[in-house]
């Protein structure tokens, strides 16, 4: 992937960048692997806003991704690399030798014509999926399960990966992208390699309208609201916060306050917390 830089033909174009989509080989998705996707605009079933700053945006169809990779000992050929509007990573279309089709996250370095497979005896090759206990120490992996058979949940965004540090019986130690080291059940599966489209984070959106296309609405600062809307609101002119510490819109302390439950069951599986955590 390369970054495409636009000429400053307008204020909106100035500094705008995007992907050149050079890796994309197929423009229309596989119809049998699509599902409808309705928009909620951040509302729940009561119509109450549960996630702010969401609404509008371009219509999308959901691409059904195989995060489980449980079709063992059946080889599949990569026939296309496609764009997926629902995630930062690209996706790869597989054609299995038994005739079935599936989408997977497109790993870095995987090209059209490559072959992949999954299973306990799969080779240590980019795109292959196998249990953590069968993956050598130091190997880069992505799409990692937290529960056997549930499907990959960790390291699925563009450019992300984790590193296998070693197998210790029932558990395998893995270093995540954040620097956190945690134990994961050795029966859980992971896919070899890092997720592709690694330059996605370098894209400059460039203008507000492009954010609206993605369903993101404007965000107002609390200090410009009324006091009944935000703890920072009110006052004459540019007033200070007026409290010992910045607050969330719901009156809780923000910036630096720990939000993770210290009694969470998975806390005992974390060997070292992520970088920057106090």
Curated annotation (Swiss-Prot):
<dbReference type="InterPro" id="IPR012340">
    <property type="entry name" value="NA-bd_OB-fold"/>
</dbReference>
<dbReference type="GO" id="GO:0015934">
    <property type="term" value="C:large ribosomal subunit"/>
</dbReference>
<dbReference type="InterPro" id="IPR005880">
    <property type="entry name" value="Ribosomal_uL2_bac/org-type"/>
</dbReference>
<keyword id="KW-0694">RNA-binding</keyword>
<dbReference type="Pfam" id="PF00181">
    <property type="entry name" value="Ribosomal_L2"/>
</dbReference>
<dbReference type="Pfam" id="PF03947">
    <property type="entry name" value="Ribosomal_L2_C"/>
</dbReference>
<dbReference type="InterPro" id="IPR022669">
    <property type="entry name" value="Ribosomal_uL2_C"/>
</dbReference>
<keyword id="KW-0687">Ribonucleoprotein</keyword>
<feature type="compositionally biased region" description="Basic residues">
    <location>
        <begin position="209"/>
        <end position="219"/>
    </location>
</feature>
<comment type="similarity">
    <text>Belongs to the universal ribosomal protein uL2 family.</text>
</comment>
<dbReference type="GO" id="GO:0016740">
    <property type="term" value="F:transferase activity"/>
</dbReference>
<dbReference type="InterPro" id="IPR008991">
    <property type="entry name" value="Translation_prot_SH3-like_sf"/>
</dbReference>
<dbReference type="GO" id="GO:0003735">
    <property type="term" value="F:structural constituent of ribosome"/>
</dbReference>
<dbReference type="InterPro" id="IPR002171">
    <property type="entry name" value="Ribosomal_uL2"/>
</dbReference>
<dbReference type="InterPro" id="IPR022666">
    <property type="entry name" value="Ribosomal_uL2_RNA-bd_dom"/>
</dbReference>
<keyword id="KW-0699">rRNA-binding</keyword>
<dbReference type="GO" id="GO:0002181">
    <property type="term" value="P:cytoplasmic translation"/>
</dbReference>
<dbReference type="GO" id="GO:0019843">
    <property type="term" value="F:rRNA binding"/>
</dbReference>
<keyword id="KW-0689">Ribosomal protein</keyword>
<feature type="region of interest" description="Disordered">
    <location>
        <begin position="208"/>
        <end position="278"/>
    </location>
</feature>
<comment type="function">
    <text>One of the primary rRNA binding proteins. Required for association of the 30S and 50S subunits to form the 70S ribosome, for tRNA binding and peptide bond formation. It has been suggested to have peptidyltransferase activity; this is somewhat controversial. Makes several contacts with the 16S rRNA in the 70S ribosome.</text>
</comment>
<comment type="subunit">
    <text>Part of the 50S ribosomal subunit. Forms a bridge to the 30S subunit in the 70S ribosome.</text>
</comment>
<dbReference type="InterPro" id="IPR022671">
    <property type="entry name" value="Ribosomal_uL2_CS"/>
</dbReference>
<dbReference type="InterPro" id="IPR014722">
    <property type="entry name" value="Rib_uL2_dom2"/>
</dbReference>
<feature type="compositionally biased region" description="Basic and acidic residues">
    <location>
        <begin position="258"/>
        <end position="270"/>
    </location>
</feature>
<protein>
    <recommendedName>
        <fullName>Large ribosomal subunit protein uL2</fullName>
    </recommendedName>
</protein>
<dbReference type="InterPro" id="IPR014726">
    <property type="entry name" value="Ribosomal_uL2_dom3"/>
</dbReference>
């Amino acid at each position: 992937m390369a970054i495409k830089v636009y000429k400053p033909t307008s204020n909106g174009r100035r500094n705008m960048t995007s992907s050149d989509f050079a890796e994309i080989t197929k423009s229309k998705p596989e119809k049998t692997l699509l599902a409808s996707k309705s928009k909620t605009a951040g509302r729940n079933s009561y119509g109450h806003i549960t996630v702010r700053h969401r609404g509008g945006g371009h219509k999308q169809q959901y691409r059904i991704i195989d995060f489980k990779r449980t079709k063992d000992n059946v080889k599949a050929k990569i026939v296309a690399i496609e764009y997926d509007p629902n995630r930062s990573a690209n996706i790869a279309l597989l054609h299995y030798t038994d005739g079935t089709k599936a989408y997977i996250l497109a790993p870095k370095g995987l090209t059209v014509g490559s072959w992949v497979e999954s299973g306990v005896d799969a080779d240590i090759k980019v795109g292959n999926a196998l249990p953590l206990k069968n993956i050598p120490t130091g190997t880069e992996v992505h799409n990692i399960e937290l529960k056997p058979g549930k499907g990959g949940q960790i390291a699925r965004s563009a450019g992300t990966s984790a590193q296998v540090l070693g197998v210790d019986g029932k558990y395998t130690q893995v270093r995540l992208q954040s620097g956190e080291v945690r134990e994961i059940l050795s029966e859980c599966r992971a896919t070899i390699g890092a997720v592709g489209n690694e330059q996605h984070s370098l894209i400059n959106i460039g203008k507000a309208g492009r954010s609206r296309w993605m369903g993101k609405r404007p965000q107002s600062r609390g200090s410009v609201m009324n006091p009944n809307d935000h703890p920072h609101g009110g006052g004459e002119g540019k007033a200070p916060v007026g409290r010992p510490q910045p607050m969330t819109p719901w009156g809780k302390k923000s910036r630096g306050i720990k939000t993770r439950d210290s009694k969470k069951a998975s806390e005992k599986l974390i060997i070292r917390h992520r970088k920057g955590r106090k």
